[in-house]
UniProtKB/Swiss-Prot annotation:
PANTHER family (UniProt xref): RIBOSOMAL RNA LARGE SUBUNIT METHYLTRANSFERASE, S-ADENOSYLMETHIONINE-DEPENDENT METHYLTRANSFERASE DOMAIN-CONTAINING PROTEIN
Molecular functions per Gene Ontology: RNA binding; rRNA (cytosine) methyltransferase activity
Record EC number: 2.1.1.191
Record localization: Cytoplasm
Function: Specifically methylates the cytosine at position 1962 (m5C1962) of 23S rRNA.
Family: Belongs to the methyltransferase superfamily. RlmI family.
Full protein name: Ribosomal RNA large subunit methyltransferase I
Upper taxonomic lineage: Bacteria, Pseudomonadati, Pseudomonadota, Gammaproteobacteria, Enterobacterales
Cellular compartments per GO CC: cytoplasm
Disulphide-bonded residues: none
Domain PUA: start-end pairs: 2-81
Species per Swiss-Prot/TrEMBL record: Yersinia pestis
Chief site of localization: cytoplasm
Protein keywords: Cytoplasm, Methyltransferase, RNA-binding, rRNA processing, S-adenosyl-L-methionine, Transferase
Catalysis: reaction(s): cytidine(1962) in 23S rRNA + S-adenosyl-L-methionine = 5-methylcytidine(1962) in 23S rRNA + S-adenosyl-L-homocysteine + H(+)
Gene that this polypeptide is encoded by: rlmI
């Protein structure tokens, strides 16, 4: 008999709106014993069936919904259906944008909570972020092998969020060939190296595809500063947009080395590039003291806020770094500024940029707004899925 989780009276409203999470505070009782990650049924206080979900006893999110259809079984066929539904959309995007690298599964928004899958050529990179996802590992891999027999599968479940689920960090080859140290992918006419084994996240920031295209369009004739550059995808975009110069800044020499290789891969002019290993905050202050000026600054920092208690300090960090950037821009210069934290509301981020401009002593115009690329969809019932936000700001 399936274990049943009974909600407290009145706590079913979010599920009726098809939100995929059940928090521990919404639960009245659990009927039966369930293993971590096991599939359970969710019922309201009157015993009405609501959903079928994965049980996560170590997490504040006590259950994550697999399905709202009572007759749907969570088996290999279920995962095959979800994969095929997701692939239909990615096929269209891949053809439109000339892609052989994209996010295949975006967790809750593709009906597979806690599961992230990126495809880079014929390599599938898997992140299992929840107890339910981990419990279904073998079944999911079987579904992937059925749908993508040509692909190797590599595990990058080495992310700290797994600790909140009581899970160990895992990484390594699941099946097929070991990925090369650097694998090139195509994006809007660019070739970009992906480091599947050692790179950030799954190896590359696919979510910034549209923002890179915007940077390319703004770059013509401009002197560009690319902050938190990682492997230089924004620098490649700027050079393809015929920038005057692009300076890429990161604290890691290894990613700057890959950035240089990316520029060489695209046969672009290395004489128009500079790579600086430094702390961005310190370098911006140094540039300000030296009177350096730029026409386009790309500000794409790592996540400043991991939990709500860090939000206030993150706001200060975002304001300070964007203030410095605005001070380095010539009149008419463009700032492309981003936040990748789901805990940072878009309206608050916009206010931070406005406050940064005020502190910098300049007026700015908001001329364009960004979000994650379309292979990272946001299902209507789960607004938390919209984590990446950005603005193009013109300095007056």
């Amino acid at each position: 008999m399936t274990v049943r989780l009974i909600l407290a009276k009145g706590r079913e409203k979010s599920l009726l709106r098809r939100h995929p999470w059940i928090f521990s505070g919404a639960v009245q009782r659990l009927e039966g014993d369930a293993l971590s990650g096991e599939t359970i049924d969710i019922l309201d206080s009157q015993g009405k069936w609501l959903a079928r979900a994965a049980y996560s006893p170590e997490s504040q999110i006590l259950a994550r919904v697999w399905t709202f259809q009572q007759d749907e079984v969570i088996d290999c066929a279920f995962f095959i259906r979800r994969l095929q539904q997701a692939q239909n959309w990615r096929d269209w995007l891949a053809q439109r944008d000339g892609l052989n690298g994209y996010r295949l599964i975006a967790g809750e928004s593709d009906g597979l909570p806690g599961i992230t899958i990126d495809r880079f050529q014929n390599f599938l990179v898997l992140q299992l972020l929840s107890a339910g996802a981990e419990y279904q590992r073998e079944t999911l891999v079987s579904a992937l092998q059925h749908c993508y027999p040509e692909c190797s599968i590599y595990d990058r479940s080495d992310v700290s969020v797994r600790k909140k689920e009581g899970l160990p960090l895992t990484q390594g080859l699941i099946c097929g060939e070991m990925p090369p140290a650097l694998l090139p992918i195509s994006e809007n006419g660019m070739q970009l190296f992906v480091d599947i084994q050692q790179g950030h996240k799954t190896g590359f920031y696919l979510d910034q595809r549209d923002s890179r295209l915007a940077a390319r369009n703004y770059a013509n004739g401009r002197r560009v500063l690319n902050c938190f550059s990682y492997t230089g995808a924004f620098a490649v975009a700027a050079l393809m947009g015929n920038c005057q110069q692009v300076i890429s800044v990161d604290t890691s020499q290894s990613v700057l080395d890959i950035a240089k290789q990316n520029i060489e891969l695209n046969q672009l002019d290395l004489s128009k590039t500079e790579f600086v290993r430094d702390d961005v905050f310190q370098l911006l202050r140094s540039y300000r003291a030296q009177g350096e000026k730029f026409d386009l600054i790309i500000m794409d920092p790592p996540k400043f806020v991991e939990n709500k208690s860090q939000l206030a300090s993150a706001c200060r960090g975002y304001k300070d770094i964007n203030m410095l950037a605005i001070q380095l821009l010539r009149p008419g210069g463009i700032l492309l500024s981003f936040s990748c934290s789901g805990l940072m509301p878009v309206d608050l981020f916009q206010k931070i940029l406005a406050d940064a401009a005020l502190d910098a002593g300049h007026d700015i115009q908001f001329i364009e707004q960004f979000r994650q690329a379309a292979d990272h969809p946001v299902i209507a019932a789960y607004p938390e899925g919209l984590y990446l936000k950005g603005f193009a700001c013109r300095v007056m």
